Every structure is written in structure tokens, then in C-alpha cells.
């Protein structure tokens, strides 16, 4: 239990504050007066004041509304709000519109809203024009208590065109989002058997035409580099981005509500065509991001994959020799894992609650998980594929973003590392791969792995897959 010492040498605890409240109407006011210059003590008193009876002398709290320390003001406002008296409406409104701390202003708006008093409605309607979207959202929250009132509803609906996306999102959810009463063809935790442990040789855009809506739980992929490999030649960078846009738009359709897409990309260098030309570096993850959020993917996290410097191409060698400014080119030891979630009005808890307790407990991540967003993992390659997913990378993604029994998808299957890893972690996989060389390579792994053994994994042409669906 935290205990503070006041100026008189007495110790202050929750119990002590409770005793003072009960012993005398003026006792707390005296304690505050004695410690007026000690903001830490004042905050402790305000935090632990608890229930405030109607007979309580609250003038000392009102006096603290102008205190220099914002945390003291915040807790003073919070305690004034407990009184739920419209006597304080004008005072709280003044704080909500004039205090120089967003934290204090937001709490003042919250206190006005918690009164649930018709007298507060005009004040909260005025606050909707505040330039700070956090304050506006707090006012919206207070006004939604009166949802159904014609004036309030019409005023709030107009905010769907508000400049701030946070405000627009709140209003859209409350007034314009379609109610998802129509149930999906399958329960959230389930998927179609003909998609489980299947590898299809074909263009992912053609394959996904035969995949039902909301059938994938997790997508993790590394798109082909723009014109940096012989198997990925595009007429222009714009054409490359449009190709990825098509792929991830269809991926969005087949992804279950509120589930994740993780895209592994990095800026790529296209070599110069001659000594009289410079090489070109394309910021793929940053350019792709725009398309993803536009189609409805919600950005959640950026994870940095850090590789050992010895494993990457040496770009700094020339500079190490001449040290001339402007020619500095550091070695690129990072790639991005951009984490997105399919847009939904539901919280993550809803997704979790779609599973039974046995699955939830069995899927819990074990000790030793990564706690920050910089992951140090060595890259992998082999004689067939020069850019292979490290197993450790796949393990983390699959364990952190899916449950046992889920269907994990990679639209650019490559050598099939994600599929093998998913299966070893008791998930199912669905892979597509356009290049026959890599498709055949995955088939050869049947003899080396009990994951891709006969009877477990189906290797299908596009036509065979189409027939299995139809």
C-alpha cells in the first residue's frame, strides 16, 4: 500500500483519507491546505478520495481547478464530476474550452457528459466545433446518451464528413455501419475443407476467384520484388503496385472479419543500366501502404526485421574508401513487416471469443515471445529460391496472429516455408504460387518432410483447384 508523508510528518494513506472524511467535514480541506505546495500529495489525496457525499465541503476541490499542475487539475475535475451537480456545468464548460491541457479539457467534457442532464446538451453541442478531435470525440460520447433525439442525431450525423478520420469513424459506426446480422456461411473459427493444406499452381488473382468470402484467418506474405528478380518483371512501377493492389483487394474479400494481413517488404534497388546512369530505389512498403488503407485494411503495427550486416549487400564499401559527403549509402539490414487488420466495428475481443476455451488455451503464446517491434532474425536462401522466409519469422507470425485450426494463406508461396510452419503449429495452410519451378520444388519436399507428405497436402493446377471447389 502506497503511503505518503505530509509536511507535518504524518503518513497519508487511503485509510487515513477515509478516516478524515468520516471524522470531520473540514478535515480533508485542512489536509489539502497544509500540503497545498506539494502537488504529489494533492494528487494522492484526489486519487483516493472515493465517494463524495452530498454534505461534503467541496470548495477546496473547486479551488484546485486553477492549480498550476495539470494532474492536480485533472483529478480535481474528475472529483467535481462525481458530484454530478449541474451547479458546476458552466465552470466545467469553461475548463473544457479554455484549459491549456487536453487531458484536463477532455476530463471536463467527460464530467459534463456523465451528468446525463438535458442542461448539458447545448454545451456539448457547442464543444463539437472544438479544433481538437479528441475533445470532439468525448463530446460525441456524451451526446450519444441522448441518441434518438432528433436534433442530436441530425447534428451528429453531419460529422460523418468531419475533417478528422477518428471523428468520422465514430459517427459512421453509430449511424451508418451496416448491422452484421447476416451470418457468414461458416462460423468464424472454421473454414472450408477444400482449402486446407492446398498448394495451387497459378496466378493468385485467378485462384482467388474461386475462394469464398471470409474463409482465410491470416495472410502472411512477401510479394515479389519489383524487377529485382528474373521471375518478377513488370512494365512499370505503377503496374507493379496495381498488381499488388489487385492481389490484396481480393485477399481482403476472402479474409475473415477483423483478421490480419502481414506484408513483408522493403525498399528495393533496381541496378543502373550503365555507368552514366544512377540506380533507382523504390519505397515499396510506403507506396503500397496507401493502397492497402484505401481498400479497407486498417494499419496496426510496423515490425522491423533486422538482419546481420554480413548477410546483406555491401553498399557502403565505396564510401568507406573516399568518405566524400553526399555519396553515403548505408547497408540495408532491415525489412518491414507491415501489420494490417481487416476493417471492422468489432474489437479484437470479439475475434478471440469466437473460439472455445480449449482452443484459446492451447494457442496461448509460450514464454520467450518477442516484446518489441525489432526482430533480429538471420535471413535464409537456398539453391532454388533466393528469398526464403526464415522458419523463425513464420513461427512468430503464425503464433502471434492466429489460433490452432486456423487457415493461413500465402499468395506468393515460394518454397512453402509458411505452409510447413503453419502445419507444424497445428494450423492449416493455403498457398498459391505462379512459378512452376517453385511449385515443383514444394512437391519434392514431400519426401523430406512429414508435413508435405502424400495424403496430407494437395498440389493442384488452377483447373484442378477450380474443379475441387465447384
Explain the meaning of each model-derived region.
Residues 144-148, 165-172, 176, 284-288, ...:
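Class I S-adenosyl-L-methionine-dependent methyltransferase module
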Residues 3-22, 30-33, 40-55, 60-66, ...:
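Structural detector for internal amphipathic alpha-helices that build alpha-solenoid repeat scaffolds
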Residues 141, 165-195, 199:
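Basic, amphipathic N-terminal segments that precede the first structured/catalytic domain
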Residues 154-164:
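TPR/TPR-like (Sel1-like) alpha-helical repeat modules
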Residues 183-207, 448-470:
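S-adenosyl-L-methionine
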Residues 69, 100-101, 107, 132-134, ...:
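Core catalytic lobe of class I
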Amino acid at each position: 500500500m502506497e503511503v505518503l508523508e505530509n509536511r507535518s510528518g504524518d503518513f497519508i494513506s487511503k485509510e487515513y483519507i477515509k478516516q478524515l472524511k468520516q471524522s470531520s467535514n473540514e478535515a480533508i480541506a485542512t489536509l489539502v491546505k497544509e500540503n497545498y505546495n506539494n502537488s504529489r500529495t494533492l494528487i494522492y489525496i484526489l486519487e483516493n478520495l472515493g465517494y463524495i457525499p452530498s454534505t461534503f465541503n467541496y470548495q477546496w476541490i473547486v479551488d484546485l481547478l486553477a492549480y498550476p499542475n495539470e494532474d492536480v487539475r485533472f483529478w480535481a475535475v474528475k472529483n467535481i464530476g462525481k458530484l454530478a451537480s449541474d451547479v458546476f456545468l458552466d465552470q466545467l464548460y469553461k475548463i473544457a474550452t479554455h484549459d491549456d491541457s487536453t487531458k484536463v479539457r477532455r476530463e471536463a467534457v467527460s464530467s459534463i457528459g456523465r451528468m446525463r442532464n438535458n442542461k448539458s446538451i447545448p454545451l456539448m453541442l457547442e464543444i463539437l466545433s472544438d479544433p481538437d478531435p479528441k475533445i470532439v470525440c468525448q463530446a460525441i460520447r456524451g451526446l450519444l446518451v441522448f441518441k434518438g433525439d432528433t436534433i442530436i442525431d441530425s447534428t451528429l450525423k453531419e460529422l460523418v464528413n468531419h475533417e478528422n478520420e477518428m471523428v468520422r469513424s465514430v459517427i459512421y459506426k453509430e449511424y451508418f455501419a451496416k448491422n452484421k446480422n447476416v451470418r457468414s456461411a461458416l462460423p468464424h473459427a472454421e473454414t472450408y475443407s477444400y482449402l486446407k493444406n492446398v498448394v495451387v499452381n497459378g496466378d493468385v488473382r485467378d485462384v482467388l476467384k474461386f475462394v469464398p468470402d471470409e474463409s482465410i484467418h491470416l495472410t502472411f506474405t512477401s510479394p515479389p520484388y519489383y524487377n529485382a528478380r528474373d521471375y518478377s518483371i513488370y512494365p512499370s512501377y505503377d503496374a507493379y503496385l496495381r498488381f499488388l493492389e489487385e492481389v490484396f483487394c481480393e485477399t481482403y474479400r476472402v479474409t475473415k472479419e477483423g483478421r490480419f494481413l502481414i506484408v513483408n517488404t522493403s525498399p528495393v534497388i533496381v541496378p543502373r543500366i550503365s555507368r552514366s546512369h544512377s540506380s533507382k530505389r523504390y519505397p515499396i512498403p510506403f507506396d503500397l501502404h496507401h493502397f492497402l488503407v484505401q481498400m479497407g485494411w486498417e494499419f496496426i503495427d510496423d515490425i522491423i526485421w533486422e538482419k546481420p550486416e554480413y548477410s546483406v549487400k555491401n553498399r557502403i564499401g565505396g564510401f568507406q574508401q573516399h568518405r566524400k559527403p553526399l555519396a553515403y549509402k548505408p547497408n540495408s539490414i532491415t525489412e518491414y513487416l507491415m501489420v494490417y487488420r481487416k476493417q471492422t466495428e468489432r474489437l479484437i475481443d470479439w475475434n478471440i471469443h469466437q473460439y472455445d476455451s480449449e482452443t484459446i488455451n492451447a494457442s496461448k503464446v509460450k514464454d520467450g515471445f518477442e516484446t518489441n517491434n525489432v526482430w533480429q532474425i538471420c535471413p535464409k536462401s537456398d539453391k532454388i529460391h533466393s528469398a526464403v522466409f526464415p522458419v523463425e519469422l513464420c513461427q512468430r507470425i503464425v503464433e502471434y496472429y492466429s489460433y490452432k485450426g486456423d487457415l493461413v494463406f500465402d499468395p506468393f508461396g515460394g518454397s512453402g516455408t509458411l505452409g510447413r510452419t503453419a502445419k507444424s503449429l497445428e494450423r492449416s495452410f493455403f498457398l498459391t504460387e505462379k512459378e512452376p519451378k517453385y511449385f515443383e520444388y514444394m512437391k519434392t519436399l514431400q519426401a523430406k518432410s512429414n508435413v508435405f507428405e502424400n495424403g496430407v497436402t494437395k498440389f493442384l493446377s488452377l483447373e484442378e483447384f477450380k474443379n475441387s471447389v465447384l
